[in-house]
UniProtKB/Swiss-Prot annotation:
Protein name, entry field: Photosystem I reaction center subunit IV
Family: Belongs to the PsaE family.
Coiled-coil blocks: none
Cellular component GO terms held in the UniProt record: photosystem I reaction center; plasma membrane-derived thylakoid membrane
Alphabetical list of InterPro entries matching this protein: Elect_transpt_acc-like_dom_sf, PSI_PsaE
Amino acid sequence: MVQRGSKVRILRPESYWFQDVGTVASVDQSGIKYPVIVRFDKVNYSGINTNNFAVDELIEVEAPKAKPAKK
């Protein structure tokens, strides 16, 4: 399940970041076509480092880190 903080690999062939790994910044639950915002370390030709993707265009590589328990 893709969720905030997950490391994901991009499967959209026309994307600048195709086969690259990025971090999920947020997942929108409203039903839009591209609900997952992914942030990358490198920028594209326009200087942008985020993009929206559909859930089926992503493969989760690493689950998000668990938050430490509060005392």
